[in-house]
Regions:
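N-terminal adaptor-interaction module of cullin-RING ubiquitin ligase components
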Residues: 1-164, 169-226, 236-243, 250, ...
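CRL adaptor-proximal regions
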Residues: 1-54, 470-472, 477-538
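LRR/LRR-like solenoid scaffold signature
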Residues: 120, 149, 175, 200, ...
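Innate immune receptor modules and recognition interfaces
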Residues: 45, 57, 61, 70, ...
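Leucine-rich repeat
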Residues: 85-91, 110-117, 139-146, 165-172, ...
Length: 538
């Protein structure tokens, strides 16, 4: 009784939501079929027939998949059979990776022996699990395909190397605020031949400067499709990996120090099939953009706070990347990208569907060209633009026939411009106006009355937001996509105090309240109307 009860309680204490705190647990052992338990009991009295016994295990597991995490836990306590099925049908685990997790790892993975997606997250103020615990996990999860490590600072190169040798089928690795370095990363690349997605943030073990050990390419280079590097002091050491990933489709570089022009030139010469590039707060100039223009299949480009990029670089991209569908530019109010670059985009990129301009000052000249040539333009966001007033909004209303979603923020438009939308943009379904102080609620009400099917969101009194980055918006979209994908994976479920969807929804609301960026609220609200700004949406 006591042993089994402590087993269930200890395991559930460690299985948690990413922001929950766990309690320390003692040594436990997994429940066995012949053990009595006060937590797991057979609810059917003697002489009663258990009609669920005729339902195959696979059907019971399928039913469990449609339940929330809490309901699954409660169902697992109905009887020993359901307890066993619920554990075996779990494919996703999120664990509090504090050091005391090591003692219960055998019990956890004895019950949950079908896990393919694992998240290990530790609080920054706590001591994380070390190499021995990671090796135990790799021995219990040989079929692991996805691993997320957060703030696991006690894991070294040796632990990652042992893990990579045991979990050779890994397809996705995401690590942040960890202490291992190039040796551990190379071990993953040398052993995981199926690796498709790699995301690295603040990897502390990478040596800065000329002595940095190069990373990659390894056998994983042949399968890699997505590489994302964030806040690395010496991200250029990943150059051999990026250049060697011939099948790379998506490259995201966020706030990585160093000059990236030369590396982008080498990448463009060797990796020509890239379709999506994100550059945020990066030291890159028109030289780097000119290099990217060699990627003729480029469809999605985000330039966020790259002040050395000018019209010259954007023109080069537009002239050679004619398949461009989504363009996000945060000009940081430097006025180095203006009508000249946008007119070139309008001239050479007829497939453009989504345009986001932050801190850029387009005029009617470029907007008319975009409306006339980009007939598939469905989503337009203009934020912090001093030149977008009523004439420009009237131009958009009259000429952007395909436009479905429009966001105007911190622009000098008034009620007159809103009235133009009443008779323009016949396909418009969503309008969002924020911090445009000349627009009144009466104008918004008139627009709602005139076009009953149009969703109008007016917020003129929101406090100023200091930052204007689109990266958080992208992260929220990717998170939404991951939740949709997870719901389609057989038997997948997060073991948490609350489900993942609830967690991400809370994070989204929190990000909106605190005003972390200028565009996050726009896309988050737009997505609720059935549209997605996801960079992966085709």
């Amino acid at each position: 009784m006591g042993q089994s009860a402590s087993t269930t309680t200890a395991v559930q204490n460690h299985i948690h939501h990413s922001r929950s705190k766990s309690r320390s647990t003692g040594v436990i052992s997994p429940m066995k079929e012949n053990e009595d338990s006060e937590d797991v009991i057979d609810v059917f009295e003697v002489g009663e027939f258990d009609y669920s016994s005729n339902i195959p295990d696979e059907c019971v597991a399928s039913i469990f998949q449609s339940l929330s995490s809490g309901d699954r836990k409660r169902c697992s306590l109905v009887c020993r059979r359901w307890f066993r099925i619920e554990g075996q049908s779990r494919h996703r685990l999120s664990l509090n990776a504090q050091s005391d997790l090591a003692s219960v790892i055998p019990s956890i993975f004895s019950r949950f022996d079908s896990v393919t997606k694992l998240a290990l997250k530790c609080d920054r103020r706590s001591t994380s699990i070390g190499d021995d615990a990671l090796v135990l996990i790799s021995q219990g999860c040989r079929n692991l395909t996805r691993l997320k490590l957060r703030t696991c600072r006690e894991i070294t190169d040796a632990g990652i190397e042992a893990f990579a040798k045991n979990c050779t089928g890994l397809k996705k690795l995401s690590c942040g605020l960890c202490s291992f370095g190039a040796k551990g990363m190379n071990a993953v690349l040398d052993n995981c031949s199926s690796l498709e997605e790699l995301s690295v943030k603040r990897l502390r073990g990478i040596t800065d400067g000329a002595a940095a050990e190069p990373i990659g390419p390894g056998i994983a280079a042949a399968s890699l499709r997505v590489i994302c590097l964030k806040e690395l002091y010496n991200g250029q050491c990943f150059g051999p990996l990026i250049i060697g990933s011939k099948n790379l489709r998506t490259l995201k570089l966020f706030r990585c120090s160093g000059d990236w022009d030369r590396l982008l030139e080498a990448i463009a010469d060797q990796v020509s099939e890239v379709v999506e590039v994100h550059l945020e707060r990066l030291q890159v100039s028109d030289i780097g953009l000119a290099a990217l223009s060699k990627c003729s299949n480029l469809e999605i480009l985000h330039l966020v706070k790259t002040p050395e990029c000018t019209n010259f670089g954007l023109v080069a991209v537009a002239e050679h990347c004619k398949l461009l569908r989504k363009l996000h530019i945060d000009g940081w109010k430097t006025n180095r990208i203006s009508d000249e670059g946008l007119i070139s985009v309008a001239k050479h990129c007829p497939n453009l569907q989504e345009l986001v301009l932050i801190g850029v000052n387009p005029t009617r000249a470029s907007l008319e060209k975009l409306a006339a040539n980009c007939l598939n333009l469905e989503r337009l966001a203009l934020c912090g633009s001093d030149t977008v007033g009523d004439p420009e909004l009237s131009c958009i209303a009259a000429k952007c026939i395909a436009l479905r979603k429009l966001c105007i923020k911190s622009c000098p438009v008034s009620d007159q411009g809103m009235e133009a939308l009443a008779s323009g943009c016949p396909n418009l379904v969503k309008v969002k106006v924020k911090k445009c102080r000349l627009v009144t609620s009466e104008a918004a009400d008139r627009l709602r009355t005139t076009r009953g099917s149009l969703a109008v969101n007016l917020d003129a009194n929101e406090p100023e937001i200091p930052d204007a980055s689109t990266s958080d918006c992208v992260a929220n979209e990717v998170g939404q996509e991951n939740r949709q994908m997870a719901s389609q994976v057989g038997g997948s479920a997060n073991i948490a105090l609350s489900n993942t969807g609830r967690s991400n929804s809370f994070k989204a609301r929190l990000g909106l309240i605190t005003g972390r960026n200028l565009m996050a609220c726009t896309f988050r609200r737009w997505s609720s109307f059935g549209g997605s700004f996801s960079s992966r949406n085709n």
